[in-house]
A protein has these predicted regions:
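Generic cytosolic/nucleocytoplasmic N-terminal low-complexity/intrinsically disordered segments
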Residues: 1-2, 48
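N-terminal beta-rich core of secreted/periplasmic extracellular enzymes
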Residues: 20-164
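Sec-dependent signal peptide recognition
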Residues: 2-8
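N-terminal signal peptide c-region/cleavage motif recognized by signal peptidases
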Residues: 14-16
């Protein structure tokens, strides 16, 4: 009987704790963003703030914050995935067309596919999966001025008119 009572007490306690997390001001979408951010930052410990600055941020269960992985790339399509996604030419090749409309469409396709992959993981309860976040390190916006630089193909070239 004691075990059953303890089980129910723990269940009710956990539901109450979850309800408290859901009612925190930083989770209230009706509040201004600045208020929500200040509330969240005030609740985070120094250790939690440091952990959130890593590319793989662990979950913070006491605040209901899921794990998140900030590292992903979509230079010419969503990278590092086993799913079938669209792969476009390198940025310098796309830039050579001078077709900014096509570049916009490629960006839209890439972002839609990235969002779909993230949503699949979210529905499956997988948070913090490597290379499956919504943060993409792309494009490389530097002007390619020196051929000795090894990342020139990741840029839109040396033409300032096109690159802006």
């Amino acid at each position: 009987m004691k075990k059953i009572s303890l089980y129910f007490v723990l269940c009710f306690w956990s539901f109450g704790a979850q309800a408290q997390v859901e009612n925190l001001p930083f989770r209230n979408a009706d509040l201004p963003l600045e208020v929500r951010v200040k509330d969240l930052v005030a609740r985070l410990t120094l250790e939690e703030k440091v952990l959130l600055m890593q590319h793989h941020s662990p979950a913070i269960p006491r605040l209901g914050i899921p794990a998140y992985d900030w590292w992903n790339e979509a230079l010419h399509g969503v990278a590092r995935t086993l799913e079938e996604v669209t792969v476009f030419p390198q940025a310098i090749g796309m830039a050579a067309t001078f077709d900014t409309e096509a570049l916009q469409k490629m960006g839209d396709i890439t972002s839609t596919e990235g969002r779909a992959l993230f949503n699949e993981d979210w529905k499956a309860g997988k948070t913090g999966t490597r290379y499956r976040g919504l943060t993409y390190w792309t494009p490389n916006i530097n002007i390619f001025r020196d051929p000795r630089w090894g990342r020139g193909q990741e840029t839109y070239g040396e033409d300032p008119y096109l690159s802006t």
